[in-house]
Amino acid sequence: MMQEIKAFNEKRAEIYWWLSSLFAKELTQEELDKYQSMEIRAFLTGLAENDALRPSVNAFVDALNRLVDRQDAQLELAADFCDLFLKTAKHGALPYASIYLTKDGLLNGEPAQKMDAWLKKHGVQVNQQLNEPADHLAIMLDFLGNLIIRSNELEQDRHMEEAFIEQNAFIQEMLLSWLPSFSQRAAEYDEFGFYNSAIKLLVAFCMLDSDYLVG
């Protein structure tokens, strides 16, 4: 039983790390090519076997299929990334919790401090290349992947239960508290729909994962 849980933990962490990579930086041509590979397509088909994930996975696959016919796809997708995530909160969907959870909607608010506390508590070093406030979505998802993998060092059922409670608290308080609002913003400004579909998939996966953790 414990081995099954740990094997599933590895899959969960991989999904969060994969999603983190989508929001960390623009995709290179090489990375984009991988999305058309059999390996990635099989991974996405596997995710779509879950009823809760199927609609958002299908939308993401649809965006991938449309990318094949999109002229200068890599450059255009990089422009989408820039317009959505790097410009202004007024005309995009900035990937920081503080934008959505504080009254003034400014960067480096209380959510960034809370995230700093999570990082310090668990001694996790974030990707220094990101050079972003701690409540940047890519950092938060990378951290969650680490939190999950670290729980695989545990051997007793009650310790794993405690780890699940903590992981669920992180998902509910640090992610699902603002991701739906972030998703709405992305839907408004992402005309092509690649990143919008990725965010919808992330929200669906967080909700599914939370259900798994409390189940």
UniProtKB/Swiss-Prot annotation:
**Which InterPro entries has this protein been placed in?**
Chaperone_TorD, DMSO/NO3_reduct_chaperone, HscB_C_sf, TorD-like_sf, TorD/DmsD_chaperones
Pfam families (alphabetical): Nitrate_red_del
Protein's cellular compartments: Cytoplasm
Q: Which UniProt keywords apply?
A: Chaperone, Cytoplasm
> In the UniProt record, does the keyword Thylakoid occur?
no
GO cellular component terms, semicolon-separated: cytoplasm
Q: Give the Gene3D superfamilies listed for this entry.
A: 1.20.120.1820, HscB, C-terminal domain
Q: What is its main location?
A: cytoplasm
* Keyword field contains Cytoplasm: yes
| GO BP, sorted A to Z | protein complex oligomerization; protein folding
* Function noted in UniProt: Involved in the biogenesis of TorA. Acts on TorA before the insertion of the molybdenum cofactor and, as a result, probably favors a conformation of the apoenzyme that is competent for acquiring the cofactor.
Q: Which family does it belong to?
A: Belongs to the TorD/DmsD family. TorD subfamily.
Q: Which NCBIfam families match?
A: PRK04976.1
The name this protein goes by in its record? Chaperone protein TorD
Species this chain originates from: Vibrio vulnificus (strain YJ016)
